[in-house]
Amino acid sequence: MLCSILSLRAQTFVKPAVKVKDTSFAVITDKGTFQACEAELKAYQEILGMEGLPTFIVYNEWNKPEDVKKVIVKLYKKDKLEGVVFVGDIPIPMLRKAQHMTSAFKMDEKNNDWRDSSVPSDRFYDDFDLQFDFLKQDSVENNFFYYNLAIKSPQQIRCDIYSARVKAVDNGEEPHAQISRYFKKVVAEHQINNN
């Protein structure tokens, strides 16, 4: 497999071997997950490239959601990004004053704990028109970042790209082993479907 690696401002890009023509995809992961699951993530990148979807892998020790979003917007503008998958420990935007955008979640934000009354949402990453006001980072769950949906923001969702998350479950098994096994299965399924 041929790929090039480019490091800019702490995040590292593993570029696809396939040239980007019409669209691209990205795997966004943390440095620890990349190091532990590098072979599986690169195999996933390669199989998607063979299917005609050039795929970037971008990893970093992400400090805040804004850093992740900058990379996504850059890939969208430069490389026609159509979607991303977040793998491992990627910051989780916890939205407040945005319950009207959910289908069923309604809770009094003033009288309930922030964690319970906020909406975890990757719309922070995949709808580029939405605007947010940073409030704080959670003191216990340091991967949670609280934002208000800004008053000047659009009040409806219109995603520019699609997104998904692959995260280990808390079942006592080592998280990277779970992620590694998952991507081995995904690649194997793609290989079966491609034959």
PLM segments and residue spans:
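Cysteine-dependent hydrolase recognition
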Residues: 11-195
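Bacterial Sec-dependent N-terminal signal peptides
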Residues: 1-11
